[in-house]
Amino acid sequence: MRDHLLDEVKGNSIFIHLLAINALEVAPPLGRLSRFATVNGKIDVKTQGTRLFVDIARIYALHCGVKAVNTEQRLALVGQRIKRSVSAIQGDIAAFHHVQTLRLQRQLASLSDGESANSLDPYALDELQQRILRESFRQADSLQERLKLDYKR
Protein backbone atom coordinates (compact mmCIF):
# COMPACT_ATOMS: atom_id res chain seq x y z
CA MET A 1 0.00 0.00 0.00
CA ARG A 2 2.86 2.40 0.86
CA ASP A 3 4.42 1.82 -2.57
CA HIS A 4 1.11 2.53 -4.29
CA LEU A 5 0.61 5.78 -2.34
CA LEU A 6 4.19 6.83 -3.02
CA ASP A 7 3.67 6.28 -6.75
CA GLU A 8 0.44 8.32 -6.67
CA VAL A 9 1.97 11.23 -4.77
CA LYS A 10 5.28 11.27 -6.64
CA GLY A 11 3.61 12.48 -9.81
CA ASN A 12 1.23 14.91 -8.11
CA SER A 13 3.01 18.26 -8.28
CA ILE A 14 -0.01 20.17 -6.92
CA PHE A 15 -0.09 18.03 -3.77
CA ILE A 16 3.68 18.41 -3.25
CA HIS A 17 3.41 22.16 -3.84
CA LEU A 18 0.65 22.45 -1.21
CA LEU A 19 2.75 20.46 1.28
CA ALA A 20 5.65 22.84 0.64
CA ILE A 21 3.48 25.91 1.21
CA ASN A 22 2.28 24.40 4.48
CA ALA A 23 5.84 23.56 5.58
CA LEU A 24 7.00 27.11 4.88
CA GLU A 25 4.35 28.64 7.14
CA VAL A 26 6.60 28.04 10.15
CA ALA A 27 10.06 29.61 10.19
CA PRO A 28 12.99 28.76 12.43
CA PRO A 29 12.81 30.92 15.59
CA LEU A 30 15.77 33.14 14.79
CA GLY A 31 15.59 36.80 15.66
CA ARG A 32 17.91 39.71 15.08
CA LEU A 33 21.43 40.01 16.42
CA SER A 34 21.82 36.28 17.09
CA ARG A 35 18.79 36.23 19.37
CA PHE A 36 16.06 33.63 19.45
CA ALA A 37 12.57 34.67 18.39
CA THR A 38 10.56 33.59 21.42
CA VAL A 39 6.97 33.88 22.57
CA ASN A 40 6.83 34.61 26.30
CA GLY A 41 10.50 33.65 26.49
CA LYS A 42 9.96 30.19 24.99
CA ILE A 43 10.16 28.37 21.68
CA ASP A 44 8.10 25.35 20.69
CA VAL A 45 10.76 22.78 19.85
CA LYS A 46 8.23 20.57 18.10
CA THR A 47 6.50 23.11 15.86
CA GLN A 48 9.45 25.48 15.40
CA GLY A 49 12.14 22.83 15.59
CA THR A 50 11.76 19.19 14.65
CA ARG A 51 8.76 19.84 12.41
CA LEU A 52 10.94 21.96 10.11
CA PHE A 53 13.21 19.00 9.36
CA VAL A 54 10.46 16.35 9.34
CA ASP A 55 8.23 18.25 6.90
CA ILE A 56 11.01 19.05 4.45
CA ALA A 57 12.42 15.52 4.54
CA ARG A 58 8.92 14.11 3.94
CA ILE A 59 8.19 16.47 1.04
CA TYR A 60 11.41 15.68 -0.79
CA ALA A 61 11.01 11.95 -0.05
CA LEU A 62 7.54 11.99 -1.60
CA HIS A 63 8.74 14.01 -4.58
CA CYS A 64 11.79 11.81 -5.18
CA GLY A 65 10.06 8.51 -4.48
CA VAL A 66 12.28 7.74 -1.48
CA LYS A 67 10.77 4.93 0.59
CA ALA A 68 12.59 5.69 3.85
CA VAL A 69 10.25 6.25 6.76
CA ASN A 70 12.40 8.03 9.34
CA THR A 71 13.64 11.58 9.11
CA GLU A 72 17.37 10.82 9.33
CA GLN A 73 17.21 8.34 6.46
CA ARG A 74 15.05 10.68 4.42
CA LEU A 75 17.44 13.60 4.95
CA ALA A 76 20.38 11.44 3.86
CA LEU A 77 18.72 9.96 0.78
CA VAL A 78 16.93 13.05 -0.49
CA GLY A 79 19.98 15.17 0.21
CA GLN A 80 21.86 13.10 -2.36
CA ARG A 81 18.99 13.25 -4.85
CA ILE A 82 18.67 17.03 -4.66
CA LYS A 83 22.45 17.43 -4.91
CA ARG A 84 23.17 18.83 -1.44
CA SER A 85 26.82 18.57 -0.49
CA VAL A 86 27.90 15.79 1.85
CA SER A 87 28.69 18.36 4.55
CA ALA A 88 25.25 19.98 4.15
CA ILE A 89 23.56 16.58 4.49
CA GLN A 90 25.62 15.80 7.57
CA GLY A 91 24.71 19.22 8.97
CA ASP A 92 21.01 18.61 8.29
CA ILE A 93 21.10 15.32 10.18
CA ALA A 94 23.19 16.67 13.07
CA ALA A 95 20.92 19.70 13.42
CA PHE A 96 17.81 17.50 13.43
CA HIS A 97 19.37 15.23 16.07
CA HIS A 98 20.27 18.18 18.27
CA VAL A 99 16.80 19.72 18.17
CA GLN A 100 15.19 16.31 18.66
CA THR A 101 17.44 15.62 21.67
CA LEU A 102 16.50 18.96 23.25
CA ARG A 103 12.85 18.19 22.61
CA LEU A 104 13.08 14.77 24.25
CA GLN A 105 14.96 16.24 27.23
CA ARG A 106 12.25 18.89 27.58
CA GLN A 107 9.52 16.24 27.43
CA LEU A 108 11.25 14.23 30.14
CA ALA A 109 11.68 17.33 32.33
CA SER A 110 8.01 18.19 31.87
CA LEU A 111 7.06 15.04 33.75
CA SER A 112 8.50 16.52 36.94
CA ASP A 113 8.12 20.28 36.44
CA GLY A 114 4.61 20.28 34.97
CA GLU A 115 5.59 22.74 32.21
CA SER A 116 4.66 22.29 28.56
CA ALA A 117 6.42 19.28 27.05
CA ASN A 118 7.58 21.12 23.92
CA SER A 119 8.10 24.62 25.30
CA LEU A 120 11.79 25.43 25.77
CA ASP A 121 13.46 28.53 27.19
CA PRO A 122 16.56 28.72 24.98
CA TYR A 123 18.25 31.12 27.38
CA ALA A 124 18.11 28.50 30.13
CA LEU A 125 20.62 26.51 28.06
CA ASP A 126 24.34 27.07 28.52
CA GLU A 127 26.16 29.21 25.94
CA LEU A 128 27.44 26.26 23.93
CA GLN A 129 24.00 24.67 23.72
CA GLN A 130 22.54 28.02 22.64
CA ARG A 131 25.12 28.32 19.86
CA ILE A 132 24.47 24.79 18.66
CA LEU A 133 20.71 25.41 18.74
CA ARG A 134 21.15 28.62 16.71
CA GLU A 135 23.24 26.77 14.15
CA SER A 136 20.65 23.98 14.04
CA PHE A 137 17.97 26.54 13.24
CA ARG A 138 20.22 28.09 10.59
CA GLN A 139 20.54 24.65 9.04
CA ALA A 140 16.73 24.36 9.01
CA ASP A 141 16.59 27.80 7.41
CA SER A 142 18.97 26.60 4.69
CA LEU A 143 16.66 23.65 3.98
CA GLN A 144 13.66 25.97 3.86
CA GLU A 145 15.42 28.25 1.39
CA ARG A 146 16.04 25.25 -0.85
CA LEU A 147 12.38 24.24 -0.52
CA LYS A 148 11.32 27.77 -1.52
CA LEU A 149 13.50 27.62 -4.61
CA ASP A 150 12.16 24.23 -5.65
CA TYR A 151 8.45 24.56 -4.88
CA LYS A 152 7.25 28.08 -4.24
CA ARG A 153 6.50 29.06 -7.81
Annotate the PLM regions.
Residues 1-153:
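A nucleotide- and high-energy phosphate-metabolite-utilizing enzyme signature
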